[in-house]
Amino acid sequence: MPVVGIKQVVDAELEGRSNTFNFRKNPSQVTTQGLWFDLALSPGNPVPKYWFGTPLQATVISQSLDGGLFHGSDVSPSKKYLRDTTFSSTSATGLPMPLVLMDYLMYYPLIDEGTTDEQFMDNTNTLTRYTDGEGVQVMAVSVAGRTGGQSFFINYTNQDGVSGRISQNVIENTSAALGVVVTSATATNANSCLFIPLQDGDTGVRSIESVTMLGTDVGLFSLVLVKPLVSTVLLEQTAPVKKDYLTESSNLPEIKPDAFLNLVCLPNGALNATGILIDMKVIWSD
């Protein structure tokens, strides 16, 4: 049965239906205060996942093919849940620092910032998890540096299967760091977004149809479809932050089969030469 309450959680742990995994990410990029950063591209354990591939072609992301934070093998027909997480840092430089753990679903590589022509996506591949798109968000991750300051928008299909939806215009920041979320800059009203704001009334994305730059630059970014699962804030080096999802939230986040898990963070300074340590416990239903 699904894990839905205290008894089911206790039974899962007593019966050995649990596992704990440990990770360490070591960013090599000089991150900037107030700019969201995708730790999936950083060295460490797990190894980096770079958002390269055939330009503009929808590419499915999975644990079996791409790695990510390993959460164990498929337990189907049982369901797997995130029991708790603990985060810590080897340096105080980038703290306090919000973190978001997400399921990375699909990406569109190498959007060219050097043209204002509409760039059409190849959607031969489709979502394999959260297939209705509900709650699925889009982030633009830098894979080649830019001058910054240009705007763009996306044309997408929403959670109801309605195509031709148009996002709000977003402005790129000026960071040259690979892995930075190009639309983020918390000190600037116009481009403070981790995720690209959708058209009013929409709550998710099934696919991206096209991207249009409103001015040219020299960089490249990839669009990544993600499903946020949990968030926390690491406040200081001497105090690891643990979150128990049984006692501190209304439900245990489900980890879908073959999910690619990884993190984004909002550092308060440079993270290069900093180790970010992650402990993660999962349980599964009987």
Predicted regions span which residues?
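Polar, enzyme-active/binding microenvironments
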Residues: 1-286
